[in-house]
């Protein structure tokens, strides 16, 4: 009987060990399956994020094409004349809300392109805002992003406003020369949009 009890005991232990190893392998399989699901979930999230970036880039391109169709294109920029009069900060905020900035000419060719576009799109307008100012340091004119301006096209005796006139204007009557003006003056303006590569 003791022998039978030992055999039964060994059988029970064997069955328990078999069940335990079966549960352990099922647990490992579930754990591995969960890891694969998490990996796939991460891959899907990455793909969705990539698709959103592509969709947003396409939306930006479409918006830029609309701007270029309504305005004019010059090299890697589009210009769009805005409606109404605004002071410098309002004009810049309006351009930013459209995805651009106030125009900043960086060459004589760009001055000529702006003169031509300004005559066509802003008939009768003598001057308009540029995205150039010296609000931070008197006499040190920078663009909207705070970068120093390397190309300058000031009219004779300009800038002359000292601390009262810190924002730059493009003058049609002075053949595209610049002058400084009080930033709170209301003027017309042109927004520029950079065309991505």
From Swiss-Prot:
MF terms in GO: carbohydrate binding
Listed PROSITE patterns: C_TYPE_LECTIN_1, C_TYPE_LECTIN_2
- Location within or outside the cell: Secreted
Keyword Transit peptide listed:
no
Q: Outline the extent of the C-type lectin domain.
A: 74-192
Q: Name one GO cellular component term.
A: extracellular space
The main location is secreted
Pfam families, alphabetized: Lectin_C
Spell out the InterPro entries in the cross-references. Answer: C-type_lectin-like, C-type_lectin-like/link_sf, C-type_lectin_CS, CLec_Tetranectin-domain, CTDL_fold
> What's in the keyword line of the UniProt record?
Disulfide bond, Lectin, Secreted, Signal
SMART domains for this protein: CLECT
Q: What is the name of this protein?
A: C-type lectin domain family 3 member A
Which Gene Ontology terms describe the biological processes this protein takes part in? ossification
């Amino acid at each position: 009987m003791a022998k039978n009890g030992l055999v039964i005991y060994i059988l029970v232990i064997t069955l328990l060990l078999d069940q335990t190893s079966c549960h352990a392998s099922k647990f490992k399989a579930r754990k591995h399956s969960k890891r694969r699901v998490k990996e796939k979930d991460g891959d899907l999230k990455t793909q969705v994020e990539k698709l959103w970036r592509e969709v947003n880039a396409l939306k930006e391109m479409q918006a830029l094409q609309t701007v270029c169709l309504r305005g004019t294109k010059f090299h890697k920029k589009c210009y769009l004349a805005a409606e109404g009069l605004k002071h410098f900060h309002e004009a810049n905020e309006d351009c930013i809300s459209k995805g651009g900035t106030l125009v900043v000419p960086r060459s004589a060719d760009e001055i000529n392109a702006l003169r031509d576009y300004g005559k066509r799109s802003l008939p009768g307008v003598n001057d308009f805002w540029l995205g150039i100012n010296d609000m931070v340091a008197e006499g040190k004119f920078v663009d909207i992003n705070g970068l120093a301006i390397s190309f300058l096209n000031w009219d004779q005796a300009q800038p002359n406003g000292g601390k009262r006139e810190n924002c730059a204007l493009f003058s049609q009557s002075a053949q595209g020369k610049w002058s400084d003006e009080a930033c709170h003056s209301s003027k017309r303006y042109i927004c520029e949009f950079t065309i991505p590569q």
